[in-house]
Amino acid sequence: MVNSCCGSVCSHQGCGRDLCQETCCRPSCCETTCCRTTYCRPSCCVSSCCRPQCCQSVCCQPTCCRPRCCISSCCRPSCCVSSCCKPQCCQSMCCQPTCCRPRCCISSCCRPSCCVSSCCRPQCCQSVCCQPTCCHPSCSISSCCRPSCCESSCCRPCCCLRPVCGRVSCHTTCYRPTCVISSCPRPLCCASSCC
């Protein structure tokens, strides 16, 4: 029987296709002949068996998300962990708050769901990602200065460089003492906290 061959004897003799059963998926049996798309089962998703050909929906789980399994066919939300957060995994299906790490913050991954403190990079400061939850000092650049980003941590002089008040950076929600500079002292900016 197959079950009786799934021990040390099986690992020494070699793992053939007939031995690649769910009960026989051991680290010692995860060779090229056993780790195939037809035999990639959840019980085979171990560190030694995490091969590119095993990165299917049934095997792409948090316990199987290793760097060598992070390929385009394995980029799924369940694989969005720190060890699998690669640039090629930053797609719409993998760009979630649990996957927003600094090394995943590329231009193709700048989405509202990725706007967290660790992903707030200049290349993510677009209209779709510039939200109050993403307004951090590291995002205080000219391309990210928008009314929704005017918080205490984002209201810096570099955000108050628009010539016309009431537009973009010089908005009523952004009038704070740190924003009062020579290029932005308009009557509209004279709020109680900004006078």
Curated annotation (Swiss-Prot):
Location of the region described as 27 X 5 AA repeats of C-C-[GIKRQVHEL]-[SPTR]-[STVQRMC] in the Swiss-Prot/TrEMBL record: 5-163
Function: In the hair cortex, hair keratin intermediate filaments are embedded in an interfilamentous matrix, consisting of hair keratin-associated proteins (KRTAP), which are essential for the formation of a rigid and resistant hair shaft through their extensive disulfide bond cross-linking with abundant cysteine residues of hair keratins. The matrix proteins include the high-sulfur and high-glycine-tyrosine keratins.
GO CC annotations, alphabetized: cytosol; keratin filament
Protein name: Keratin-associated protein 4-11
Family classification: Belongs to the KRTAP type 4 family.
Sequence repeat positions: 5-9, 24-28, 29-33, 34-38, 44-48, 49-53, 54-58, 59-63, 64-68, 69-73, 74-78, 79-83, 84-88, 89-93, 94-98, 99-103, 104-108, 109-113, 114-118, 119-123, 124-128, 129-133, 134-138, 144-148, 149-153, 154-158, 159-163
Oligomer status and interactors: Interacts with hair keratins.
Tissue expression: Expressed in the hair follicles.
Keyword entries, A-Z: Keratin, Repeat
PANTHER family according to UniProt: KERATIN ASSOCIATED PROTEIN (PTHR23262), KERATIN-ASSOCIATED PROTEIN 4-11-RELATED (PTHR23262:SF183)
Organism: Homo sapiens (Human)
